[in-house]
Structures are given as structure tokens and as C-alpha cells.
Amino acid sequence: MTISILGAGAWGTAIANSLSGKQNVILWTHNKTTFESISRTRESDKLLGCQIPENVSVKLAIKETVNASAMIFAVPTQSLRKVCQQLHDCNLKKDVAIILACKGIEKSTLKLPSEIVNEVLPNNPVAIFSGPSFAIEVAKKLPYSMVLACQDDTLGSKLISELQQENIKLHFSSDVVGVQICAALKNVFAIACGIVLGKKLGFNAHAALVTKSMNEVKTLYLAKTDSVSIDIDTLLGPACLGDLIMTCTSLNSRNLSFGFKIGSSNNSFDAQQTLSEGKSVIEGFSTAQSAFNLAEKLKIKMPICEAVYRLLYESASIEDTISVFVG
């Protein structure tokens, strides 16, 4: 089986390394400098010290990725629609499975990643690959556990069989929407938790904030799906609780580190400048705006997401923001 991975950032490169022992892997980047660097050194500047195996073929032209059996998308959510359109223009075959490893909500439409793919590539089956996974550990082939969410049980079982390895434990879920909501919101919550930790408000406040975060996941899920309950396996499994624990407790998390800098800066932190200077994508920054707008559209209250949004986009005071987190 040949798998194409779209996006050669830290996450995409890590997945390529992780799967290279069992699959033929194509790693695509739109960035010519990145392409030339990886081709020359077999190393990514996003994952220094991790050699990219020779059986990972690096490509610059997206048309060279379309003959794979499955495609894993590891691009920023805000770029997903553009990449899907490029594949559509390359006549991607309809039986090629799209596996989404990106997390977020599209700002312009307030759609989840699977909804974007269904619009642009309606004939391709979609699955979600999500859970607690730091890129550097995945690249080193350390053990990790993820959820593979798909509405087609047969396809889900097939993909798990192909992707699962000795160090990768995959759990099947049919809750495509719930898994994506957890994946998107946890980055916003990580920024909030980083602020609390940066302000040295203690682990009691931190734990309370993580607990409140799970309630906001539930609130958005119920409103978006018009359901009366959320799948408990989603809420307490790797995709939600597992990812929250990891992303909201370790400074290896880009989003937590971003929030920590805000909390420890004594109101002197320039979020926009930090984003423009950094090499990493802070998905929680974009998702805070998307989540706030989606909550407004659905007429629901999501106080943590709203507080992070108002701090980052409307210059709310850090004191007012923290009062929401610990109140």
C-alpha cells in the first residue's frame, strides 16, 4: 500500500517516519526550500535529529501524490480547502481514502475538516486520525494511541489494519463529528491552560479549567449535531480526554507554550508578532475565532473559547480573561 502524506511540517513528517516501516510513503510539500532541504539532508528543520528514511519519497508537485491508495492530510485546517481543490484539479480517483490529521474549524465557513473535504471531493471516503501525539515522539516511533473515526465500518477496519503497527494502537470510532470537535477545541483550551500556568495560578485552577473545557466540547457537540447526548467513548477516549491531558499539561504543546508566554508576560506579550516570527502553526489561535463565531451562530455559550478569542482578537485584559477561566 502506498500512502501520500500532504504537508511536510512537523506533524506530516512525523507520520511519514512512523509509517515508513510498513508502507511506501510519499511526503508532499508545497515549499520549494523545504523540498530541497529534505531531499538533500533527509532531515526536517521541524524535527531536528530525526532522519527521514530513504523509502519516504519527497515530492514538490502535488500531481505526483494522487496514485496512492490513501492520503493523509497534515496541512493547517485553513489551507485544507485549497489543497483539496488542487487534488480535484489533478483528477484524484474517487476510491482514494482521505484521512484527516488536521485539527481546527475553517474560519470563512465555520466547517469542520470533513465537511470541507465532502464539499470539494464528494466522491472520496473520509476518515479522521486524531488523538494525543507529539510529533517528535511519533517520529521516533515511540508508542502512541489514536482514534480512527469513519462512518464506514468496513473502510475503518481496512485502514486500521493498514496503518496499525507495533508502536501505534488505533481505536475505531464512528463519531466523526465528535472526534473533530475535540481535536479542534483542545488547542484553544491549551492556550487557556498555558495562560493559567504562566500566571502561576496553581495546578488546582489548571485541573478545574481542563474539566470545564470538556463541558464546552459537549456543549458544541450537542448544538452542532442536534443530539441529546455525546458518545461517552469519544469524550473519555484518546480523541478528547487523552488529547486534552497531553496538550493542556506539557510545554511540548505549541498551543500551551503560546498561552504560557501570554500568562508570564505581564501584559507585554504581542501574540500577533509571535505568530509572524514563529515557524510553527498555532492552530488554537485561528480556532479561537472560529469557535467563537460558531458558538454565536449556534446561539450557545462557550465561555472559555470566548475569553481566549476576546484576549487574542479584541485586546481584552488578562485579568478579565483569567476571571473566566477560574470563575
UniProtKB/Swiss-Prot annotation:
Q: Which residues form the active site?
A: 186
Name a single GO cellular component: cytosol
Keyword line:
Cytoplasm, Lipid biosynthesis, Lipid metabolism, NAD, NADP, Nucleotide-binding, Oxidoreductase, Phospholipid biosynthesis, Phospholipid metabolism
GO biological processes: carbohydrate metabolic process; glycerol-3-phosphate biosynthetic process; glycerol-3-phosphate catabolic process; glycerophospholipid metabolic process; phospholipid biosynthetic process
Give me the reactions it catalyses: sn-glycerol 3-phosphate + NAD(+) = dihydroxyacetone phosphate + NADH + H(+); sn-glycerol 3-phosphate + NADP(+) = dihydroxyacetone phosphate + NADPH + H(+)
EC number of this enzyme:
1.1.1.94
| Regions crossing the membrane | none
Q: Where does NADPH bind?
A: 11, 30, 103, 135, 254, 281, 283
Residues reported to bind sn-glycerol 3-phosphate: 103, 131, 133, 186, 243, 253-255
Q: In which pathway does it act?
A: Membrane lipid metabolism; glycerophospholipid metabolism
Q: Which family does it belong to?
A: Belongs to the NAD-dependent glycerol-3-phosphate dehydrogenase family.
Q: What does this protein do?
A: Catalyzes the reduction of the glycolytic intermediate dihydroxyacetone phosphate (DHAP) to sn-glycerol 3-phosphate (G3P), the key precursor for phospholipid synthesis.
Q: What is this protein called?
A: Glycerol-3-phosphate dehydrogenase [NAD(P)+]
Lineage of the native species? Bacteria, Pseudomonadati, Pseudomonadota, Alphaproteobacteria, Rickettsiales
